[in-house]
């Protein structure tokens, strides 16, 4: 769960009965670049993609910052989503445009029915 105001990501443990325990901060996304944590998705390897300062942050499953997809020009990412026939296209919404980038690892598909 990301917190836009405090600029960090919490992880929780989901128990067999569906209850949630063990809340902890796994990553602080504070940075001098513009942007805040907002949209967040995962890939099939469990990596976390979260909009944040400077673009889209890519984090390992334990919250280690592995890199940032830089947007440049002071642009702010607001949300992200996986798409394309192979789920390897990451769509990035910004204030006045939509960008996309091809990734090596497919994203977790959104179920059509819940």
Go through each PLM region and give its residues.
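N-terminal first-folded block
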Residues: 1, 12-15, 40
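Conserved beta-strand positions in repeat-built beta-propeller and related beta-rich domains
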Residues: 1-5, 47-53, 59, 91-96
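A detector of repeated loop/turn-to-beta-strand junctions in beta-rich toroidal repeat architectures
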Residues: 6-8, 20
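Structural motif
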Residues: 8-11, 59, 98-102
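Short loop/turn segments immediately following beta-strands, especially the blade-tip
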Residues: 12-19, 102-111
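Blade-edge beta-strand/turn elements of extracellular beta-propeller
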Residues: 13-33, 58-72
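Beta-rich, blade/repeat-based domains predominating
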Residues: 29-53, 74-88
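A short, acidic, flexible beta-alpha connecting loop/helix-capping segment that sits on the rim
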Residues: 75, 84-86, 93-99, 104-107
């Amino acid at each position: 769960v990301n917190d836009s105001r405090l600029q960090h990501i919490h992880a929780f443990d989901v128990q067999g009965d569906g209850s949630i325990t063990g809340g902890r901060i796994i990553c602080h996304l504070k940075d001098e670049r513009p942007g805040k944590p907002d949209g967040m998705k995962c890939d099939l390897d469990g990596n976390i993609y979260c909009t944040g300062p400077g673009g889209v942050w890519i984090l390992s499953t334990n919250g280690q910052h592995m890199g940032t997809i830089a947007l440049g020009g002071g642009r702010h990412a607001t949300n992200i989503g996986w798409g394309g026939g192979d789920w390897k296209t990451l769509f990035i919404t910004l204030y006045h445009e939509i960008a996309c980038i091809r990734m090596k690892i497919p994203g977790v598909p959104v179920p059509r029915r819940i």
